Amino acid sequence: MRDIGSQPAAGVRSMKVRDRALEIIRERISRGDPLYDFTGLASRPKVDAASDELRTYLSEALILPEIRELCREHFDAPEYEVLVAPRTTAAVIATILALEPRSVLHVLPEDGEAHPCVEEGCRLAGAEYEEVEESEIPDLDGFDLVVVTGCDVRWNVVSEDTLREVASAEAVTLLDDASGDRVRRLHGQKPGPRYGFDLVVTSCDKLMDGPRAGVLIGRDDLVEGVRRVCEGYGWTVDGPTLAAVKRAFEEFELSSLEARLKELERVYERLKDELDVERTGAGLVFHGVEREVEIGLGLLRRYGIMTITALGYERVDRTLRFNLLTEDAERFGYDRFVEVVKGELS
């Protein structure tokens, strides 16, 4: 079990890197230079609603019921309740606080990297935290809550066998499907509730044109408990956010991602013999790269390529990686991307 602690020095360095990246973005915008999202996070949320629908309380009355039905259809879970949170991380932490578990198991895809929110939620709740890859799953009877990461920060995808095994546990089960809801489906898997998970959460900005909000869908009694925690901490969303969430689910089409997945395969084939590159569920991860942060900042400065390496928050995995399923990756051009990466990393 890993020790839970803070790393203030690393945090300061992360903020300085991110501040520099944001400065470069401002400079490019002021010159009229383009920017391209290779993070999978910089979506283009759309707000389309009458002014009254965007007002506090009115938006909950008018828009939230539509979101509920859209999400039930999207997740193929007609009996589940729906909650919109300001962030997926807020929904995850609120779930842990609501359940007050004594022990939590966090299951990652093989070679996966964990988002820190599950561990942080356990620290706040005073729960024991254990983190394993899917090949190392212990006896699930010893845990009150089991969390599975459907697709990790490098877009490694969990197996269906693991989803079925965990969903059948006696413990409460949560599928953290931030980008996994889209990435897993691209690789032939089903929506989280179809495996029997009690709760599933996804991010509306990851490979969807929605706001940076999280949607939690699950058993009525559990979602109601999470809702109370979110409201108690002020983790609620406003009318424009609800309108953008609604539009994101209305307009989502898997077919556009399927076409880009074919381009990802083609790009990988062109790079694999020249660079130490790994193809994952949604992009490419480059290994053995020195000065990753400097390269990430350089790509942003010269080409407008936005990466997590340059723009990530504290405790983020800064391994150089590119999500090639974004609309911006297509707009940048896959052939151009190959030449740029070869020039920067060869």
Swiss-Prot record:
Cofactors demanded by this protein: pyridoxal 5'-phosphate
Keyword tRNA processing attached: no
Gene3D superfamilies assigned: 3.90.1150.70, Type I PLP-dependent aspartate aminotransferase-like (Major domain) (3.40.640.10)
Modified residue annotations for N6-(pyridoxal phosphate)lysine: K206
Superkingdom classification of source: Archaea
GO MF entries: L-seryl-tRNA(Sec) selenium transferase activity
Coiled-coil regions listed in the entry: none
Record's keyword terms, sorted: Pyridoxal phosphate
SUPFAM superfamilies in the cross-refs: PLP-dependent transferases
The name this protein goes by in its record: UPF0425 pyridoxal phosphate-dependent protein MK0620
Organism of this sequence: Methanopyrus kandleri (strain AV19 / DSM 6324 / JCM 9639 / NBRC 100938)
Record lineage: Archaea, Methanobacteriati, Methanobacteriota, Methanomada group, Methanopyri
